[in-house]
């Protein structure tokens, strides 16, 4: 595992991939993390941006992508909601993965509903792992 909060994390990624870099990066932080992710992406690699947790805009140019034949695409779940046939198919696949034991939901912490504010604070302060569940 590589900790992206460490200063040299992108070099660790390159070392872990034999100097090549990953073929696919799923990026949801934005800002400098997204920029560093693109720098360590393999030639012909693809980066999917599906969030902006840092609330910062990543900045890169088309030339950066062109020289290494890379692509960056965006994904927003809300936009998928306009395609109910895709959602239905994906939900059925997820259910099959759960039934078949290929997918496990990891619950990191539970909070009573009355402690929802505390749960949100724990998430914001990055004190949680796995899913956080509010119990009614």
Which residues does each predicted region cover?
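Glycine-rich phosphate-binding loop and adjacent beta-alpha segment
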Residues: 32-102, 135-136
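Adenosine-nucleotide cofactor-binding segment
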Residues: 1-33, 87
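Solvent-exposed, non-membrane alpha-helical residues enriched in polar/charged side chains
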Residues: 10, 14, 38-39, 63, ...
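Residues in well-ordered alpha-helical elements
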Residues: 10, 23, 35, 63, ...
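Short catalytic-loop micro-motif centered on adjacent basic/acidic residues
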Residues: 23-26, 46-49, 105-108
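C-terminal capping/lid region of NAD(P)-dependent oxidoreductase domains
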Residues: 19, 95, 100-110, 117-136
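A structural signal for hydrophobic residues in beta-strands of small regulatory alpha/beta folds
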Residues: 2-3, 81, 107
